[in-house]
Swiss-Prot record:
This is Photosystem I P700 chlorophyll a apoprotein A1. One of its GO terms (biological process) is photosynthesis. It comes from Araucaria araucana (Monkey-puzzle tree). Keywords: 4Fe-4S, Chlorophyll, Chloroplast, Chromophore, Electron transport, Iron, Iron-sulfur, Magnesium, Membrane, Metal-binding, Oxidoreductase, Photosynthesis, Photosystem I, Plastid, Thylakoid, Transmembrane, Transmembrane helix, Transport. The gene is psaA. PsaA and PsaB bind P700, the primary electron donor of photosystem I (PSI), as well as the electron acceptors A0, A1 and FX. PSI is a plastocyanin-ferredoxin oxidoreductase, converting photonic excitation into a charge separation, which transfers an electron from the donor P700 chlorophyll pair to the spectroscopically characterized acceptors A0, A1, FX, FA and FB in turn. Oxidized P700 is reduced on the lumenal side of the thylakoid membrane by plastocyanin. The lineage of its organism: Eukaryota, Viridiplantae, Streptophyta, Embryophyta, Tracheophyta.
Length: 716
């Protein structure tokens, strides 16, 4: 650690652009404000010193954590101050969650709908109520305390960010000590983090949820600290607590099976995963990561060395294998970030799919709006992270890649046969696009000609997803075969099991897959492959291409390769990120359409006392979604028309947002299709008029560059 490396100066920070010689001189044209935003956090452009860059990134992480904690604190505060949480807790099947009441200004109070129990407010779909119930929060006071705790923690984070940059800044060697970092992150963050959460679940969540499920009034349930301090209270609910740690040390672990279970399926009272299953899961995860956190060699001569592992990693056809990658990952934070974003993005999308198929919190499964919101949220976040991975991989290629140290290793070999990779990927995209779209067009044509017997459908020419059905079947039959102690499969969606209904609403049931899913699946494959094609091309051609051999010298983002080189605009790595983002939006839109229609058609709905299920859209997915016309008529129009007709009701905000979102979308296209010269000419005639009237601005207006225009377009 280096002491007092940089003094704290508010005067310096107050000056816009203090991090750059050019920008700190102040504005000449309006481009200055764009560059200010573009470069403020581009630490590479402030200095070449890797240690200084590392310290800035490290310090910024604390700031990021502070922002997250302040946001979370706000969520908990709203739950404490403005919500009907206690009412919802006492009757979660009839009362809807609300944590915002609109003030009566210019008639906006129309937005406050009746959410049940005499409470009028906006219904929320964030899933916080369900999460709070699962973690054992029973009163608004507890939410207040947590909110205050969050703010205190945020303050600590802000202090830590300042302290570790201005007072005690780590040296470069500390940032590059990967084995120590792996040990501490795996054992500390993931291992002890999971263990402490498992502990909280056992001692607080389990007993409180057990009593809530049994219908005990939340106000009569003992407070969390009483369960922790008084073991007899827990022993009344879970008898093995009376035995203490004896079964643990005598290896009779099965004694604890009253609160560490392996049941599978859902709790029929709440429609959520069995809390005893999730405790068991977190305990197991903790053990795994605590072991993993002792695997890497630091002060003693045992354990893995990452450099040795990477350099030993050679295949028969891969030349030098992973030699040289260790140096890349310890000197290029962009390369490190690219890998982490790709993995975290993929994981986030996996989470999106588990939130509905294995709903982790009580009553989450019957709150359809929240289910849809959580799925959409996690899909979008995952998409952004994956595009970010490609962006930072390209920045690594332009700024940090040194071809002289990477000879005949895997990265070098991938770069050398990039033409084969990209052209094959291109062929795959063409194949998927024409075939998947062709299946729909065929169906539309046959439908229009009145020949249903010649359509691809479950009732005519079947294209059943046999592999997906085989996987479903394997999982559905697992409990009796591979997991004999489990009473149900991991997810009810696999099949076999009965449906779970809570409060006359379907929580979950086996999801049938048919021709319609097979068709839309190939649209997913198509859009994902196009996204990958664009992003990967951006990375592999970031340094050079046949068109522009010296691309690396032009940087990560540039509009064109100078005058006289026609057709070289929009070829920078940045432009590939832009186009990739565009296709990521395309891909995720189809995913969200598929999810919301499939769930409304085949899963969500009400159940009568006789056990008859009525789905929201009456099971029309299998026959309607096999034509383009069906998607337009029975999904997009059928659902959008309800939103558009919401004016004058408490849902009117959504109608206005719907309209506004399309306006913003159209606005973005204006920037994307704009001709820069056209705007520059327009601006200059307007400036001339200002000059005539002696009201000309001191800062000369300038049309957006291509890169800036695309930035505005993509943001909208």
């Amino acid at each position: 650690v280096e002491r007092d490396p940089i003094k704290t100066s508010f005067e310096k920070w107050a000056k816009p652009g203090h991090f750059s010689k050019t920008l700190s001189k102040g504005p000449n044209t309006t481009t200055w404000i764009w560059n200010l935003h573009a470069d403020a956090h581009d630490f590479d452009s402030h200095t070449d010193d890797l240690e200084e860059i590392s310290r800035k990134v490290f310090s910024a992480h604390f700031g990021q954590l502070a922002i997250i904690l302040i946001w979370l604190s706000g969520m908990y505060f709203h739950g404490a101050r403005f919500s009907n949480y206690e009412a919802w807790l006492s009757d979660p099947t009839h009362i809807k969650p609300s944590a915002q009441v609109v003030w009566p200004i210019v008639g906006q109070e129309i937005l406050n709908g009746d959410v049940g129990g005499g409470f009028r407010g906006i219904q929320i779909t964030s899933g916080f109520f369900q999460l709070w119930r699962a973690s054992g929060i029973t009163s608004e006071l507890q939410l207040y305390c947590t909110a205050i705790g969050g703010l205190i923690f945020a303050g600590l984070m802000l202090f830590a960010g300042w302290f570790h940059y201005h007072k005690a800044a780590p040296k470069l060697a500390w940032f590059q000590d990967v084995e120590s970092m792996l040990n501490h992150h795996l054992a500390g963050l993931l291992g002890l983090g999971s263990l402490s959460w498992a502990g909280h679940q056992v001692h607080v969540s389990l007993p409180i949820n057990q009593l809530l499920d049994a219908g005990v009034d939340p106000k009569e349930i003992p407070l969390p600290h009483e369960f922790i301090l008084n073991r007899d209270l827990l022993a009344q609910l879970y008898p093995s607590f009376a035995k203490g740690l004896t079964p643990f040390f005598t290896l009779n672990w099965s004694e604890y099976s009253d609160f560490l279970t392996f049941r599978g399926g859902l709790n029929p009272v709440t429609g959520g995963l069995w809390l005893t299953d999730t405790v068991h899961h977190h305990l197991a995860i903790a053990i795994l990561f605590l072991i993993a956190g002792h695997m890497y060699r630091t002060n003693w001569s045992i354990g893995h060395s990452l450099k040795e592992i990477l350099e030993a990693h050679k295949g028969p056809f891969t030349g030098e294998g992973h030699k040289g990658l260790y140096e890349i990952l310890t000197t290029s934070w962009h390369a490190q970030l690219a890998l982490n974003l790709a993995m975290l993005g993929s994981l986030t999308i996996v989470v999106a799919h588990h939130m509905y198929s294995m709903p982790p919190y009580p009553y989450l499964a019957i709150d359809y709006g929240t289910q849809l919101s959580l799925f959409t949220h996690h899909m979008w976040i995952g998409g952004f992270l994956i595009v970010g991975a490609a962006a930072h991989a390209a920045i690594f290629m332009v700024r940090d890649y040194d071809p002289t140290t990477q000879y005949n290793n895997l990265l070098d070999r991938v770069l050398r046969h990039r033409d084969a990779i990209i052209s094959h990927l291109n062929w795959v995209c063409i194949f998927l696009g024409f075939h998947s779209f062709g299946l729909y067009i065929h169906n539309d044509t046959m439908s229009a000609l009145g020949r249903p017997q010649d359509m691809f459908s479950d009732t005519a020419i079947q294209l059943q997803p046999i592999f997906a059905q085989w996987i479903q079947n394997t999982h559905a039959s697992a409990p009796s075969l591979t997991a004999p102690d489990a009473t149900a499969s991991t997810s009810l969606t696999w099949g076999g099991g009965d449906l779970v209904a809570v409060g006359n609403k379907v929580a979950l049931l086996p999801i049938p897959l048919g021709t319609a899913d097979f068709l839309v699946h190939h649209i997913h494959a198509f859009t994902i492959h196009v996204t990958v094609l664009i992003l990967l091309k951006g990375v592999l051609f970031a340094r050079s291409s046949r068109l522009i051999p010296d691309k690396a010298n032009l940087g990560f983002r540039f509009p064109c390769d100078g005058p006289g080189r026609g057709g070289t605009c929009q070829v920078s790595a940045w432009d590939h990120v832009f186009l990739g983002l565009f296709w990521m939006y395309n891909a995720i839109s189809v995913v969200i359409f598929h999810f919301s229609w499939k769930m409304q058609s085949d899963v969500w709905g009400s159940i009568s006392d006789q056990g008859v299920v009525t789905h929201i859209t009456g099971g029309n997915f299998a026959q309607s979604s096999i034509t383009i016309n069906g998607w337009l008529r029975d999904f997009l129009w059928a659902q959008a028309s309800q939103v558009i007709q919401s004016y004058g009701s408490s849902l009117s905000a959504y109608g206005l947002l719907f309209l506004g979102a399309h306006f913003v979308w159209a606005f973005s296209l204006m920037f994307l299709f704009s001709g820069r010269g056209y705007w520059q000419e327009l601006i200059e005639s307007i400036v001339w008029a200002h000059n005539k009237l002696k009201v000309a601005p001191a800062i000369q207006p300038r049309a957006l560059s291509i890169v800036q225009g695309r930035a505005v377009g993509v943001a909208h």
